[in-house]
Amino acid sequence: MGIKKFKPTTNGRRNMTALDFAEITASRPEKSLTEKLSKKGGRNNQGRLTVRHQGGGHKRKYRIIDFKRNKDGIAGRIATIEYDPNRSANIALVHYIDGEKRYILAPKGLKVDMQVMSGVEADIKVGNALPLSNIPVGTLIHNIELKPGKGGQLVRSAGTSAQLLGKDGKYAIVRLQSGETRMILATCRATVGAVGNEEHELVNIGKAGRSRWLGKRPTVRGSVMNPVDHPHGGGEGRAPIGRSGPLTPWGKPALGYKTRKKNKASDKYIVRRSKK
């Protein structure tokens, strides 16, 4: 999709950009594949804030996405490419020849009326899902499983892709979008191609209100809070931090402090750390 610019009719629209939705072919989702989505406002079941900067926004319906891609050996036709408000990537509605309908992530290059398939017999073609053991080395992939049958967990955002670098026994070696290289069981599935809608990161929101439409609340600086709310808070006027270095709202060192658990069980699968 291309980027649409707006005329500077107001200050908010002066540098605003949006996607032109040229690839979108349907305005309403498949009713049988949607669910009610209630707002949580970033709170957990105790009512406590666990994710900051969430709340409000336009009402949404959740689209049920097939991340498992386990409908083996049955061809499906791409019926529509649709917008999904719950993720950065677009989604594609697949009509299988046995009558079932499913949503999948829309990879780059996928068009209406193209065919997709899952399973070991599927061709190496954009949108097809196979075990890593059946995918040639060097192929770009997305929607990668970490446990066989659990469904894709890695590389699902717009414009992202991973590359299959090699195979070593029962493991496949994959370079992820972050630059990290890790081993994944070769029986895990992945989908061929890169995730579409790669211009998503180029969109300029333009004004605060548009962020609120998306359910994003403001990010407030710690230095303008009270001491009860943030380690940087309090003091008279624009006071310095008063500590040896900047801290998170929970008192942990900020800016470069490593938060990954030491001796994590999955460390042995990481061949090379991500680039900083």
Swiss-Prot record:
Stored SMART domains: Ribosomal_L2, Ribosomal_L2_C
Top-level division of the source organism's lineage: Bacteria
Main function: One of the primary rRNA binding proteins. Required for association of the 30S and 50S subunits to form the 70S ribosome, for tRNA binding and peptide bond formation. It has been suggested to have peptidyltransferase activity; this is somewhat controversial. Makes several contacts with the 16S rRNA in the 70S ribosome.
Protein name: Large ribosomal subunit protein uL2
A single MF term (Gene Ontology): rRNA binding
Gene3D superfamilies: 2.30.30.30, Nucleic acid-binding proteins, Ribosomal protein L2, domain 3
UniProt subunit comment: Part of the 50S ribosomal subunit. Forms a bridge to the 30S subunit in the 70S ribosome.
GO terms under biological process: cytoplasmic translation
Cellular component terms per the entry's GO annotation: large ribosomal subunit
